[in-house]
């Protein structure tokens, strides 16, 4: 099984050695702090032709594995385009991914949802596709592996994000799209592959395809244990022979195996050194995340109350109610991380649930502060959000208190702060899908509950690869069941 085609795909007859293409490539090179390798030069040449001569319905697909310099190359391309006065819009699937994109590109990136959708009206049930008023603009989307085309339970446009993104971009005069990501990462939840990184799937939109695949580890990353071991996993996936690889840790300082005996101490040291916002535990399930969150709050942070100031929380369900009065945030997204600034008053117990009034800030949205009501019951549960039974109980209990005909009561329900309370989990340990698109200085990867049969499943390797590549500086493998070249400390 091939993870990705091993050759680049360019439209028939494309030449990337003309003077204008070479001129643009030179401009990008001047924006880079290093000399590009051969693969990176191929990317520059292909992008130059895409920009200068590509069909109006052309799309560029950039797959770059961890350590291949994809992000720095795109950063250089954005700088060169800006110097030329060429308009660009940078997008990412989540607020956290947009923040990372902003940091490495030097230009503001937005979430896809914020850019391409508009709310139908206050208290409406959804968002419509907005009009693309941009002209002659290149839309560059990072972390495209996260873009789904499934319509289940979506309030946005057609519900198929990739369809809507493509329709939005190409409805603008002279606008084109660049999709970049890493096919070795986890695909969207419930999908076997990432449709936005699949050239054949994109061709079904009648688009002209430019596809470049970066595989060569950049010289600057060659000494990284994180990237060395990510490459081991990638090679296993590409080979199609899924057998447990031997990880190499001994000669690297940035990846270690840690046992439970030293885990709390090591996490605590990471908090002291880099802060809670730069340390994350990545797990395989919500149940494991709940166990780690409980242990961290009890044994490292010594927090006895269920919710206190400085608690980090993860939003577990989209919410369209609380952000209405805030220009910076259109809606609160599933996966957004918030920090508790203040807890107001006493816990309210209503409708069989516990509620708290809090002020939170959004680190991935310019530290915007917002007063919200949250549901506490999800914090310590093994489910990602309220169960179907709890949700139904909340709905029927609130509706029973409202008066008027069914339409009037439903309109009032949409205004009810209890029905619209934020559903949140603790954010010290999260699942890998929730971590995707983000980066932290220190990443602890929970491998203690992994069964041997996982080693024959592609999903396991994608999960571990995605988790390892969330780290900027240090990876700790917790009770790693894979063979390594060093003992646990």
List each language-model region with its residue ranges:
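Pre-P-loop entry segment of helicase/translocase ATPase cores
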Residues: 2-58
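Generic structural signal for buried aliphatic residues
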Residues: 43, 313, 338, 440-443
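ASCE P-loop NTPase helicase motor core
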Residues: 44-45, 49, 54-243, 250
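C-terminal accessory regions
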Residues: 349-489
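Short, solvent-exposed amphipathic alpha-helical segments in soluble enzyme
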Residues: 106, 296-300, 462-463
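Conserved helicase motor core of P-loop NTPases
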Residues: 18-24, 47-48, 55, 170-175, ...
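Conserved SAM-binding loop
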Residues: 36, 90, 281
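Short, conserved phosphate/pyrophosphate- and ester-handling motifs at nucleotide-, phospho-/glycolipid
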Residues: 40, 94, 285, 437
């Amino acid at each position: 099984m091939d993870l990705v085609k091993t050759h680049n795909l360019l439209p028939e007859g494309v030449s990337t050695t003309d003077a204008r293409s070479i001129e643009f490539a030179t401009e990008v090179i001047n924006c880079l702090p290093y000399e590009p390798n051969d693969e990176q030069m191929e990317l520059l040449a292909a992008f130059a032709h895409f920009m200068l001569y590509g069909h109006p319905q052309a799309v560029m697909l950039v797959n770059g594995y961890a350590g291949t310099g994809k992000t720095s190359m795109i950063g250089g391309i954005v700088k060169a385009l800006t110097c030329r006065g060429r308009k660009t819009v940078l997008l990412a699937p989540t607020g956290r991914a947009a923040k990372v994109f902003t940091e490495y590109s030097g230009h503001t990136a937005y979430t896809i949802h914020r850019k391409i959708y508009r709310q139908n009206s206050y208290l409406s049930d959804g968002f419509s596709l907005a009009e693309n008023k941009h002209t002659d603009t290149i839309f560059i989307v990072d972390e495209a592996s996260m873009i789904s085309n499934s319509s289940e339970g979506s309030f946005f446009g057609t519900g198929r994000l990739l369809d809507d993104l493509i329709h939005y971009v190409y409805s603008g005069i002279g606008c084109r799209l660049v999709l970049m990501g890493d096919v070795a990462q986890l695909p969207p939840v419930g999908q076997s592959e990432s449709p936005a990184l699949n050239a054949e799937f994109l061709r079904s939109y009648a688009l002209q395809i430019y596809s470049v695949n970066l595989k060569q580890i950049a010289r600057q990353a060659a000494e990284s244990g994180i990237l060395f071991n990510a490459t081991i996993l990638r090679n296993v996936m590409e080979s199609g022979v899924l057998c447990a690889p031997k990880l190499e840790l001994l000669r690297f300082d940035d990846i270690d195996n840690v046992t439970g005996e030293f885990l709390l101490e090591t996490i605590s040291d990471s908090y002291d050194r880099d802060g809670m916002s730069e340390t994350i535990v990545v797990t395989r399930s919500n149940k494991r995340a709940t166990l780690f969150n409980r242990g961290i709050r009890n044994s490292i942070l010594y927090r006895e109350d269920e919710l206190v100031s400085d608690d980090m929380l993860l939003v577990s369900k989209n919410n369209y109610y609380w952000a209405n009065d805030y220009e910076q945030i259109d809606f609160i997204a599933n996966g957004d991380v918030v920090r508790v600034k203040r807890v107001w008053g006493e816990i309210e117990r209503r409708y069989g649930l516990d509620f708290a009034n809090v002020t939170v800030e959004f680190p991935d949205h310019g530290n915007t502060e917002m007063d919200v009501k949250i549901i506490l019951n999800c914090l310590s549960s093994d489910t990602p959000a309220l169960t179907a039974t709890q949700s139904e109980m909340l709905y029927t209990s609130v509706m029973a208190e409202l008066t008027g005909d069914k339409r009037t009561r439903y309109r009032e329900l949409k205004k009810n702060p209890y029905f619209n309370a934020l559903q949140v989990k603790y954010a010290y340990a999260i699942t890998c899908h929730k971590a995707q698109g983000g980066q932290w200085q220190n990443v602890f990867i929970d491998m203690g509950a992994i069964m041997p049969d996982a080693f024959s499943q592609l999903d396991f390797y994608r999960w571990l690869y995605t988790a390892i590549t969330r780290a900027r500086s240090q990876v700790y493998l917790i009770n790693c069941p894979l063979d390594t070249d060093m003992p646990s400390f």
